Regions:
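Short polybasic/polar patches that bind polyanions
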Residues: 21, 55, 215
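Active-site glycine/GP-rich loop and adjacent strand/helix microenvironment
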Residues: 76-79, 90-93, 100, 106, ...
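Active-site diphosphate/adenylate-binding microenvironment
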Residues: 2-38, 44-51, 66-70
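Conserved adenylate-forming
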Residues: 40-75, 92-101
Length: 327
């Protein structure tokens, strides 16, 4: 198969994510590679590598921002935030439960967060994590509780946007429970969580995690959103836009932006499964310039229209995900 013989996007051969560990899947010469994103994994694992240059990073930022804003910065009436509304005192000041970019330059998640911080431009935004000596991501509990408690006392009416891995939220919630703290963040505050629990002894079902976020932080369940992304991609999926209260018990369906496409592939037949059936998630990402456009993941999902319901890693697949970086 060659580019000349491909007449439909579904015919593009997909490269497995595991190939990024062994091969340099880029058209960039070594001298032009100014950045590289690594997959998150155990210290014994060889990480995936996604190489970038200034031009590809510009496409990455251009890709992530409108879909992020569409899903996380929408107003209560469903309208999207205007460019002016994403800056200044009226915007949700983001708090990132990760180390800052300087400490983890190979994290695509933290690069994404820094892009969001720059786009929003809120002076109150902060990275409240740090890199431990063993390479794990730790939370600076003094910094995060000071930021959150200050706003729960309504010294500012600005709603908050808290972003982090699932396990970073577990760390934070455990700390708040230990200190018997319950915060009530300003109305309209939102949470974005991502990643899983592989290689962690403490796990929480999604609904329990979100219930605890509501209990300890005062963020309404319908304002808690999940993100799906990986270092090999340049676009992200979100489990629908901010949910109306009547929908929170329905399956959480992830959708990629319009410049990406999705298939759920049967591991037995190699063909796309029918609606409602389970298979491996395959993603076609036009934002992946200078790299591979079609990615075959090892994640299981249920086909839901143009989106998918995420089930988790396929059996025998290597554990990965940014939550692995949280000790």
């Amino acid at each position: 198969m060659t580019p000349q013989t491909v007449v439909h996007w579904t015919q593009i051969p997909a490269v497995p994510t595991s190939a990024f560990k062994e091969l340099e899947l880029t058209s960039l010469p070594p001298a032009e590679r100014t950045a590289v994103f690594h997959s998150s994994g155990t210290t014994e694992q060889k990480p995936s590598r996604h190489f970038h240059c200034p031009e590809s990073l510009a496409v990455y930022a251009t890709s992530l921002w409108p879909w992020f804003a569409e899903n996380l910065l929408r107003s209560a009436d469903g309208s999207s935030a205007s460019p002016d509304e994403t800056r200044g005192q009226a915007v949700r000041a983001p708090i990132f439960l990760t180390p800052p970019p300087a400490q983890v330059p190979h994290s695509s998640l933290v690069y994404m967060f820094e892009t969001v911080r720059q786009k929003i431009g809120a002076a109150e935004s902060a990275f409240v994590g740090e890199l431990a000596s063993d390479g794990a991501w730790k939370l600076d509990f003094n910094a995060v509780t000071a930021k959150l408690a200050d706003n729960s006392k309504l010294k500012t009416q600005n709603s908050k946007l808290i972003l982090g891995t699932a396990f970073s939220f577990v760390h934070l919630l455990d700390f708040l429970a230990e200190k018997n703290l319950r915060l009530t963040l300003p109305a309209g505050s939102r949470v974005m969580e991502t990643g899983g629990y592989k290689n962690h002894s403490r796990t929480l079902p999604k609904e329990e995690l979100h219930a605890l976020i509501t209990e300890r932080l005062g963020v309404a369940r319908e304002n808690i959103l999940c993100e799906y992304g990986m270092s090999e991609l340049s676009s992200q999926a979100y489990d629908s836009k901010i949910h109306p209260p009547s929908s929170i018990l329905h399956p959480r369906v992830f959708n990629f932006p319009p410049w990406s496409r999705l298939q759920i592939i049967s591991p037995e037949t190699g063909r796309e499964v029918a609606e409602g059936e389970t298979g491996l998630i395959r993603i076609f990402d036009l934002a992946n310039v200078f790299s591979v456009a079609a990615i075959q993941t090892e994640d299981l999902g249920i086909r839901r229209g143009d989106g998918f319901e995420l089930l988790g890693r396929a059996q025998l697949a290597e554990p990965r995900g940014c939550s692995l970086m949280n000790a």
